[in-house]
Amino acid sequence: MSDFQREQRKNEHVEIAMAQSDAMYSDFDKMRFVHHSIPSINVNDIDLTSQTPDLTMAYPVYINAMTGGSEWTKNINEKLAVVARETGLAMAVGSTHAALRNPRMAETFTIARKMNPEGMIFSNVGADVPVEKALEAVELLEAQALQIHVNSPQELVMPEGNREFVTWLDNIASIVSRVSVPVIIKEVGFGMSKELMHDLQQIGVKYVDVSGKGGTNFVDIENERRANKDMDYLSSWGQSTVESLLETTAYQSEISVFASGGLRTPLDAIKSLALGAKATGMSRPFLNQVENNGIAHTVAYVESFIEHMKSIMTMLDAKNIDDLTQKQIVFSPEILSWIEQRSLNIHRG
């Protein structure tokens, strides 16, 4: 594939992603908090700091991986980096493979660090990238963490995608052992299982982003790029973010779990934190905001999102993220069926 074709693919991904819409109904709607009428705290008591063994984020919300690798996506990364700088959010760039192949593309990613020199930035590579390239991806952005995306359904629907996956787990293990910053194993919208969590724990992984279905749909994106558009029947493949978080429960004491995929509102973010996530990521909401409404409007959107999270936590009498994990939740029969059939051991306050 030529550099021009790769740039074109990056732009196509963004164009199709922006055209997608949020689900009107999701698994986040299949779980409810129990309301208690009189809180014992005030809004000013709320501490939204997200703390993991290696990373401290001012807020449990981050701009998740989306783009880079073309002139248009450079402009997007520049604007998102300004939003991150002005709001204190962490930010992940999209796959840096384009820059690792062609130094001319490096600036489409490094613009994020240029615009946000003191901020928290995650670099991003695929599970098949050589260890030396993973190290280069971290150095490229002076990144505080490295996302490794695992995206087999996307690759298999992508006309020019990868068809070989046998070496992925061993390669991830090699990267984890060599990279000096936290390595986050990140799905791309298909969710995670307890079996995967077991395998990742065995090779020393300490961070995952479950990225469940319900948000940006890369099966649909790649199917749109197919000549016959003949794989749309896989559109609903995978686990939702709620199901994925439940799948991680037994591993949350050893692995820091981030949640993304289909988060629409501050309430969805709070529900993710209540299910054990340490932070929540969003891609398309930020992309659409900054492209359609500009930087200032997106900054205001983030500030409002954070304030709404504080209001919800006040209603729940939760001073911090850890408190949220003790709050009472009622699940729908469908989610309870998933828990039962998957033999998940769920204990709640």
Swiss-Prot record:
GO molecular function: any one?
NADPH binding
* Broad class of enzyme this protein falls into: isomerase
Q: Where does Mg(2+) bind?
A: E155
Give the protein's cofactors. Answer: FMN; NADPH; Mg(2+)
One GO term of the cellular component aspect? cytoplasm
Record: residues binding substrate: R9, K10, S95, T96, H97, Q154
- A Pfam family that this protein carries is FMN_dh
Known InterPro entries for this protein?
Aldolase_TIM, FMN-dep_DH, IPdP_isomerase
The EC number on file is 5.3.3.2
The main location class comes to: cytoplasm
Keywords, comma-separated and alphabetical:
Cytoplasm, Flavoprotein, FMN, Isomerase, Isoprene biosynthesis, Magnesium, Metal-binding, NADP
Q: Which GO terms describe its biological process?
A: isoprenoid biosynthetic process
User: What does the UniProt function comment say about this protein?
Assistant: Involved in the biosynthesis of isoprenoids. Catalyzes the 1,3-allylic rearrangement of the homoallylic substrate isopentenyl (IPP) to its allylic isomer, dimethylallyl diphosphate (DMAPP).
Could you describe the subunit structure of this protein?
A: Homooctamer. Dimer of tetramers.
Q: Which PANTHER family match?
A: ISOPENTENYL-DIPHOSPHATE DELTA-ISOMERASE
Per the record, the similarity remark reads: Belongs to the IPP isomerase type 2 family.
Q: What is this protein called?
A: Isopentenyl-diphosphate delta-isomerase
Source organism of the structure:
Staphylococcus aureus (strain MSSA476)
